[in-house]
């Protein structure tokens, strides 16, 4: 529970019901967790696991915002998932610098998945994305990168 335990006492807003968080408002202040797979972003469109382009505009906006301290992402592999989610992300990162805004990621899948977990991780790491072994570890690293854990 990122907002109520790891960020105790720190303002946190989200578009999904996370214990300890408030709803996102237009005048964002503090830390924000946005689930781009939520119905709000996928209505009439495929989930980002299937079509990662669904999150391209929101990601570009976050990376262009000097107030963004870190971007936390997860990639889910398997049948029905995008053929190359890491490759898609990398193709959208023209001009991105890990020093400016780090991206922390986790990859859920196996070597038996069509996308091969190790191949996806290698692509992300080669581009400077910090990859952890689980989404919980990625959340902790994202918190640490902005001095909160």
Regions of interest found by a model, annotated:
Residues 130-138:
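Short acidic-hydrophobic, aromatic-tinged amphipathic segments that line or gate anion-handling sites
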Residues 15-67, 75:
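Active-site rim loops that border cofactor/substrate pockets in soluble metabolic enzymes
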Residues 85-92:
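Charged helix-capping and loop-helix junction motifs
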Residues 2-4:
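Short, small-residue-biased leader/transition segments that mark boundaries at the very start
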Residues 104-125:
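Glycine-rich, charge-decorated loop segments at or immediately adjacent to ligand/cofactor-binding or catalytic sites
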């Amino acid at each position: 529970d990122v907002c109520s335990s790891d960020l105790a006492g720190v303002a946190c807003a989200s578009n999904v019901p996370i214990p300890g968080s408030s709803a996102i408002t237009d005048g964002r202040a503090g830390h924000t967790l946005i689930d781009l797979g939520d119905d709000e972003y996928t209505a009439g469109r495929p989930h980002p696991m299937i079509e990662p382009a669904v999150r391209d505009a929101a990601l570009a906006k976050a990376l262009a915002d000097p107030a963004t301290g870190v971007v936390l992402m997860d990639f889910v592999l398997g049948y029905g998932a995008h053929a190359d989610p890491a490759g898609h992300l990398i193709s959208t990162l023209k001009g991105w610098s890990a020093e400016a805004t780090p991206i922390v990621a986790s990859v859920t899948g196996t070597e038996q998945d069509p996308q091969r977990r190790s191949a996806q991780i290698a692509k992300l790491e080669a581009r400077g994305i910090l990859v952890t072994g689980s989404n919980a570890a990625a959340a902790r690293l994202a918190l640490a990168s902005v001095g909160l854990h």
